[in-house]
Amino acid sequence: MGPSSCLLLILIPLLQLINPGSTQCSLDSVMDKKIKDVLNSLEYSPSPISKKLSCASVKSQGRPSSCPAGMAVTGCACGYGCGSWDVQLETTCHCQCSVVDWTTARCCHLT
């Protein structure tokens, strides 16, 4: 085998290494551009009308505690460690334990 054959055998693997690398690089750049274009088209645009969440706690003696008009229950707490409660008509917390000394309703509305 002559020197030109040896040189050819050395150059072929080197050319294969160079060519796929540049192809992969251009494929990566094309994919990056496509991903950026899609993300830019999905950009979040907030509504010009902004709302504020206002909340208050209403504590009552006994088992029920109701929110003021226009507010809705978002959570309840019951005295004597009672962890069993339900919301009635979206505006009233009702503790389900037989003995409860107080009930608190967390009431919120959007302004």
Curated annotation (Swiss-Prot):
Q: Its GO biological process terms?
A: epithelial cell proliferation
**Which CDD domains did the record assign?**
RELM
Disulfide links within the chain: 55-108, 67-107, 76-93, 78-95, 82-97
Reply yes or no: does the keyword Zinc-finger apply: no
Q: A Pfam family name for this chain?
A: Resistin
Domain of life here? Eukaryota
The signal peptide, as residue positions, is: 1-23
Q: Tell me the subunit arrangement.
A: Homodimer; disulfide-linked.
For this chain, the family text in UniProt reads: Belongs to the resistin/FIZZ family.
- Please report the name of this protein according to its UniProt entry: Resistin-like beta
Recall the taxonomic lineage recorded for the source organism.
Eukaryota, Metazoa, Chordata, Craniata, Vertebrata
